[in-house]
Amino acid sequence: YYKVNPEGIALEVHDLNKEVPAKGGKKTILDKVSLSIGANEFVAIIGGSGAGKTTLMTAMSGFDSKVTGHVYCNGTDLHENFQTLKNIIGFVPQQDIIYENITLKKMLYYTAKMKMPQDTSNQEIEERIEEVLRMVELSEHKDTYIRRLSGGQKKRASIAVELLANPGLFFLDEPTSGLDPGTEEHLMRTLSKLSKEQEKTIVMVTHTINNLDLCDKVIIMGYGGRLCYCGSPAGF
């Protein structure tokens, strides 16, 4: 069981490479990607279709073992120590994995029972649920059935689920997909705030270049899984 460093989690990525079988040989979908992400940074990965955005993020999160290269969390090799480190990692997929026919609070309670340590008391669970609802600005919707939430609210609910276990490292796959511009900006501001106030390193894949000024760092992926840029949003 790995405790998060109070200063947050920094990531060092060295030579991440992935090839898949293709007609006439192999196709490179990650091409020796190396980069650094500082503790508590909010980072967006952008790029064209098929540039390897989600592949890179999944490799960085440790959930894809079929890559070569190394990812270090505060100096610890993520792939070699994944079973120890996975408790500090939150991952929100593009499709919301939440039940529609129960209230938000009930869904969070059931999830907390699974995700939080077994000796957590009911009172501690209740307090944590209230805390994560405040973080994602859904406190007033706690008794709402999930099917009645808007698209943006459902995405926040998915984020709340992953926040229950208090991960220090947080990955999101296209969290703003399908949201209107106002809702998208609101969600981006929430993520930016989480990275600073809750001391979380947040990495997201996005198809849009709107609101990137809210990020600390932008990673641009190019054709063939090549890293084209990694730096401040002001620099590209």
Language-model features and meaning:
Residues 46-49:
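The feature captures the beta-strand-to-loop junction immediately N-terminal to the Walker
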Residues 170-173:
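Catalytic Walker B motif of ABC-type/P-loop ATPase nucleotide-binding domains
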Residues 100-117:
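Q-loop/switch helix immediately C-terminal to the Walker
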Residues 61:
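Helix-to-loop junction immediately C-terminal to a conserved catalytic motif
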Residues 159-160, 187:
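Hydrophobic anchor residue at the start of the ABC signature
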Residues 109, 124-141:
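Conserved ABC ATPase "signature" region
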Residues 164-168:
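A short, proline-enriched helix->beta-strand linker immediately N-terminal to the Walker B motif
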Residues 70-84:
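ABC ATPase NBD Q-loop/coupling interface
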